[in-house]
From Swiss-Prot:
Chain sites annotated for binding ATP: 13, 173-174
The protein's Enzyme Commission number: 2.7.2.11
Designated name of the protein: Glutamate 5-kinase
Residue intervals of the PUA domain: 278-355
Gene name of the record: proB
Length: 368
């Protein structure tokens, strides 16, 4: 709970069983309005909030009159196409009365595996957050295949948390935490209040959920916890069907907290520092000083570009004496970087023919 009170950036994952009534397949409107009040309160506290929401297939299933049983892939994709519109509209209508602008961001797990797409999604999310909007991230189930079959929005939520450098990830689910065994089958199962480290013994305890709507079971939640905590993000599993579920969590509702393993930004920089570089950038004395002062690398300070690399690839950064200063992720291709080296940021559009980003390597994508 202390992690949530001090958090600067919070990602909240909402399972489809919370959003959609099991019997009628209708949206749980009153519950969503209470969640919107939670989001508005967090925003007033100065926190950034990102929502990762399941529910498009469940909503579309009801609209199309499809059965509640497992659907063939094509029908799942069709249901998602119908449900995504309804899902986006529901969040917009719930948050607009609080003066909050919402934005729909559709992603798949593949977006995290390709560095260029990863940087694109990260830049979009950061821009939306900077403009005060609340991104509603949803799996793009209309084109995804493995994600639909295995229901991996828990891991997707963890990836979003890692991407935006969140301090806390909250998985609102139909279970109230992590248990030593499946509580539906074992009356002696005990819930953990806090897990400091995910050990092989903890992994062996993971079972599967019993919901007919949410596909993500305890195994995917544990995978999400491993991903998030390794990146310095604390994670909570909490029963979310109650009204104002985040307020309930803060008030001490039953849950399991997974302890973050370090600071998110430090973890990210370690990840960047461990990458194999694809090219080399040599900078002048002024740029070297700017980097040591915590600034981004601008094209004007670049004196030489070496290698054949793409956007998002890791580059070594050398000082004017040839000494390695660090490394970072390039926001431009090698060809673009060579064209821009030595030029001011306000000349980028004239040189490339489009308005690119001011920094060649942003300080958040750099490890010195």
């Amino acid at each position: 709970m202390a992690a949530l009170s001090t958090a600067r950036r919070v990602v909240i994952k909402i399972g489809s069983a919370l959003l959609v009534d099991r019997t009628s397949s209708a949206l749980r409107q009153e519950w969503l309005l209470s969640l919107a009040e939670d989001v508005a309160r967090l925003k007033k506290q100065g926190k950034d909030v990102i929502l990762v929401s399941s529910g498009s297939i469940a909503l579309g299933r009801g609209a199309l009159g499809l059965p509640r049983k497992d659907l063939p892939l094509e029908q799942s994709q069709a249901a998602a196409a119908v449900g995504q519109i309804r899902l986006a509209r529901a969040y917009e209508e719930a948050l607009a009365p609080h003066g909050i602008t919402t934005a729909q961001v559709l992603v798949t797990l593949e977006d995290s595996e390709n560095r260029r797409r990863y940087l694109n999604s990260r830049a979009t999310l950061e821009t939306l957050i900077g403009l005060g909007a609340v991104p509603i991230v949803n799996e793009n189930d209309t084109i995804a295949t493995d994600e639909i079959r295995y229901g991996d929005n828990d891991r997707l939520a963890a990836q979003v948390a890692v991407t935006v450098g969140a301090d806390v990830l909250i998985l609102l689910s139909d279970v109230d935490g992590f248990y030593s065994a499946n509580p539906a089958l074992d009356p002696d199962a005990k819930r953990f209040d806090r897990i400091e480290q995910i050990t092989p013994e903890i992994e062996a305890m993971a079972g599967d959920g019993v919901s007919g709507l949410s596909k993500g079971g305890m195994i995917t939640k544990l995978l999400a916890a491993k991903m998030a905590t390794a990146a310095g993000c604390a994670m909570a599993i909490s029963e979310g069907s109650v009204m104002s579920p985040v307020s309930a969590l803060e008030a001490g509702a039953a849950s399991t907290w997974f302890t973050a393993q370090g600071d998110p930004q430090v973890a990210r920089k370690r990840w960047i520092a461990a990458m194999k570089t694809r090219g080399v950038i040599t900078v002048d004395e002024g740029a070297a000083k700017a980097l040591h002062n915590g600034n981004s690398l601008l094209p004007a300070g670049v004196r030489h570009v070496e290698g054949d690399f793409g956007r998002g690839d890791p580059l070594a950064i050398l000082g004017p004496d040839g000494r390695k200063l660090g490394q970072g992720l390039s926001r431009y291709t090698a060809e673009e970087a060579r064209a821009l080296q030595g030029h001011r940021s306000d000349e980028i559009e004239a040189i490339l023919g489009y308005a690119g980003r001011a920094a060649l390597i942003h300080r958040d994508d750099m490890a010195l």
